[in-house]
Regions:
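PDZ/PDZ-like peptide-tail recognition elements
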Residues: 37-86, 90, 128
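Bacterial N-terminal signal peptides
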Residues: 17-31
């Protein structure tokens, strides 16, 4: 039987130089990457002044969501949704909202199949959540749609 030996076409020394070159290229490009990352961290929605309300049943504090210039600029290229709704400003860690996965910064736009345009309408719909059936809550997180089911 003839033994075959595997021959390397790239030596370890050459591979190491390629790794170093890649690391240097990434270090050189990192200022551009961090700028894009910083833009992604800017808020997409803010609270409309004097619009805060609370949903005691779900355990969230809401305000009417107002889209920012960042969202307007990123909506088309990043395929982000622009909707009216209620921005969650805080979540009680012991409430059903936190248990269901809602977090600060989420924008609720539909509850139980009904669109909500502001914090007052969202709080009313959230306070109707019952104990016998799940209620679907649609929301945006960083401009992307999600949904959860809540029940008392």
């Amino acid at each position: 039987m003839h033994k075959h030996r595997c021959h390397r076409f790239v030596s370890r020394h050459t591979a190491w130089h390629g790794t170093v070159a890649l690391a240097l290229a990434l270090a050189f490009l990192s200022p551009g990457i961090s700028v894009a990352g910083q833009e992604a961290d800017l808020p997409l929605y803010t609270c409309l002044a004097d619009s805060e309300t609370t949903s005691g049943i779900v355990g969230v504090q809401l305000c009417t969501a107002e889209h920012t210039e960042t969202l307007v600029n990123r909506s088309e290229p990043d395929n982000l949704q622009v909707r009216r709704g209620a921005l969650i400003s805080s979540v009680d860690a012991t409430g059903i909202g936190a248990t269901g996965g809602l977090t600060d910064g989420d924008v609720i736009y539909r509850i139980g199949g009904n669109d909500v345009a502001d914090a007052g309408a969202a709080a009313q719909e959230l306070d109707r959540i019952g104990t016998s059936a799940d209620t679907v809550v649609n929301f945006l997180r960083k401009g992307r749609p999600y949904r959860i089911k809540l029940r008392q």
